[in-house]
Amino acid sequence: MARSLANAKIQSVFGSEKLSNAVFRRGFAAAAKTALDGSVSTAEMKKRAGEASSEKAPWVPDPKTGYYRPETVSEEIDPAELRAILLNNKQ
Protein backbone atom coordinates (compact mmCIF):
# COMPACT_ATOMS: atom_id res chain seq x y z
CA MET A 1 0.00 0.00 0.00
CA ALA A 2 2.81 2.39 0.88
CA ARG A 3 4.48 1.61 -2.41
CA SER A 4 1.38 2.55 -4.37
CA LEU A 5 1.00 5.79 -2.44
CA ALA A 6 4.60 6.73 -3.20
CA ASN A 7 4.05 6.02 -6.90
CA ALA A 8 0.85 8.05 -6.89
CA LYS A 9 2.67 10.96 -5.29
CA ILE A 10 5.42 10.89 -7.93
CA GLN A 11 2.89 10.73 -10.76
CA SER A 12 0.87 13.59 -9.30
CA VAL A 13 3.98 15.77 -9.12
CA PHE A 14 4.80 15.20 -12.78
CA GLY A 15 1.20 15.51 -13.92
CA SER A 16 0.34 18.62 -11.98
CA GLU A 17 3.53 20.57 -12.72
CA LYS A 18 1.85 22.72 -15.36
CA LEU A 19 -1.22 23.22 -13.19
CA SER A 20 0.78 24.24 -10.14
CA ASN A 21 2.82 26.74 -12.17
CA ALA A 22 -0.38 28.31 -13.42
CA VAL A 23 -1.78 28.55 -9.90
CA PHE A 24 1.38 30.06 -8.46
CA ARG A 25 1.74 32.58 -11.27
CA ARG A 26 -1.86 33.67 -10.88
CA GLY A 27 -1.39 34.07 -7.15
CA PHE A 28 1.69 36.21 -7.69
CA ALA A 29 -0.11 38.42 -10.21
CA ALA A 30 -2.98 38.98 -7.78
CA ALA A 31 -0.58 39.82 -4.96
CA ALA A 32 1.34 42.28 -7.15
CA LYS A 33 -1.86 44.05 -8.19
CA THR A 34 -2.98 44.33 -4.57
CA ALA A 35 0.37 45.77 -3.54
CA LEU A 36 0.15 48.45 -6.21
CA ASP A 37 -3.43 49.36 -5.30
CA GLY A 38 -2.63 49.64 -1.61
CA SER A 39 0.42 51.88 -1.91
CA VAL A 40 0.32 55.37 -0.44
CA SER A 41 2.44 58.27 -1.61
CA THR A 42 4.91 60.00 0.68
CA ALA A 43 2.98 63.27 0.47
CA GLU A 44 -0.16 61.56 1.73
CA MET A 45 1.75 59.99 4.63
CA LYS A 46 3.18 63.37 5.65
CA LYS A 47 -0.30 64.90 5.48
CA ARG A 48 -1.70 62.12 7.69
CA ALA A 49 1.15 62.53 10.18
CA GLY A 50 0.42 66.26 10.40
CA GLU A 51 -3.25 65.60 11.08
CA ALA A 52 -2.46 63.10 13.82
CA SER A 53 -0.07 65.45 15.61
CA SER A 54 -2.69 68.21 15.78
CA GLU A 55 -5.10 65.89 17.62
CA LYS A 56 -2.71 65.02 20.45
CA ALA A 57 -3.24 66.37 23.94
CA PRO A 58 -0.85 69.04 25.23
CA TRP A 59 1.82 68.01 27.68
CA VAL A 60 1.66 69.48 31.20
CA PRO A 61 3.97 69.01 34.20
CA ASP A 62 2.93 66.37 36.71
CA PRO A 63 2.44 68.03 40.13
CA LYS A 64 3.96 65.09 42.06
CA THR A 65 6.97 64.20 39.91
CA GLY A 66 7.56 67.36 37.90
CA TYR A 67 7.93 65.36 34.70
CA TYR A 68 5.80 66.24 31.69
CA ARG A 69 2.88 63.96 30.76
CA PRO A 70 -0.17 64.22 28.49
CA GLU A 71 -2.97 66.28 29.97
CA THR A 72 -5.58 63.58 29.42
CA VAL A 73 -3.75 60.84 31.39
CA SER A 74 -5.52 59.88 34.60
CA GLU A 75 -3.63 59.56 37.86
CA GLU A 76 -2.10 56.14 38.46
CA ILE A 77 -2.77 54.23 41.67
CA ASP A 78 -0.37 51.89 43.42
CA PRO A 79 -1.51 48.23 43.15
CA ALA A 80 -1.02 47.69 46.90
CA GLU A 81 -3.21 50.70 47.71
CA LEU A 82 -5.87 49.55 45.25
CA ARG A 83 -5.91 46.09 46.85
CA ALA A 84 -6.25 47.60 50.32
CA ILE A 85 -9.15 49.79 49.17
CA LEU A 86 -10.97 46.86 47.58
CA LEU A 87 -10.44 44.58 50.59
CA ASN A 88 -11.71 47.23 53.02
CA ASN A 89 -14.91 47.73 50.99
CA LYS A 90 -15.74 44.02 51.08
CA GLN A 91 -15.71 43.78 54.90
UniProtKB/Swiss-Prot annotation:
Protein's UniProt keywords contain Nucleus: yes
Pfam families assigned to the protein according to its UniProt record, in alphabetical order: LEA_3a
Superkingdom of the source species: Eukaryota
Localization terms from the record: Cytoplasm; Nucleus
Coarse class of the protein's main subcellular location: cytoplasm
Entry's Gene Ontology cellular component terms: cytosol; nucleus
Induction note: By salinity and drought stresses.
InterPro entries: LEA_3a
Disulfide cross-links: none
Region (Disordered): 47-72
GO biological process, any: response to salt stress
Assigned keywords, A-Z: Cytoplasm, Nucleus, Stress response
Entry similarity comment: Belongs to the LEA type 3 family.
Protein name in UniProt: Late embryogenis abundant protein 2
Species: Arabidopsis thaliana
Lineage summary: Eukaryota, Viridiplantae, Streptophyta, Embryophyta, Tracheophyta
